[in-house]
């Protein structure tokens, strides 16, 4: 978390929380949802400003209830999740392929899930900021779930051995010479299984 953010929390400790104004879409884009977007159930405007995107990513936090928020100075801006708290991309690097979130953090995968709509979710550990209480934060590697970006589905299919299941696909996939499980899941089970709140409220 940015030092200036921590200082502002000490200086202004009782700023009201903000809900519904910021969203994370299925492609890992932050979206600003003004009053018109909220009233008309629109996705909102994609934030394209590079510095603002980086600022949000550095100060992206999860609380004990499973609500994700952006610590914007002294104010917590809770984030509506279109899918999952993290969106994964398969990216090349000098060490080979990497799984990276929208916040540029690495995912250490332990498996994957496939739902009835053909979505793939990467299960694994992500180094993330956790809010405890009274402006106390810590970082830890926590198991979570990340929707795989749809541009990487073809690449994933090349790594996977699939078998048809009742509602989706199961099987395994190869990641860095390891065979990891691919299990079926229903999309409406994702949030409860991984203990996050997609539409946070006060």
Which residues are covered by each model-predicted region?
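Residue-level detector of beta-strand structural context in well-folded domains
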Residues: 20, 68, 110-111
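Surface-exposed beta-loop interaction hotspot
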Residues: 84-116
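Short, well-structured hydrophobic secondary-structure segments
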Residues: 32, 40-85
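Generic recognition of long tandem-repeat/solenoid scaffolds
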Residues: 31-32, 69-71, 99, 119-124
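Glycine-rich, aromatic-bearing surface loops/beta-hairpins
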Residues: 107-109, 113-202
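Surface loops and adjacent helix of pleckstrin homology
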Residues: 27, 35, 73, 81-83, ...
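Long alpha-helical, hydrophobic tracts
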Residues: 1-54
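Charge-rich alpha-helical segments
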Residues: 76-88, 95, 130, 137-140
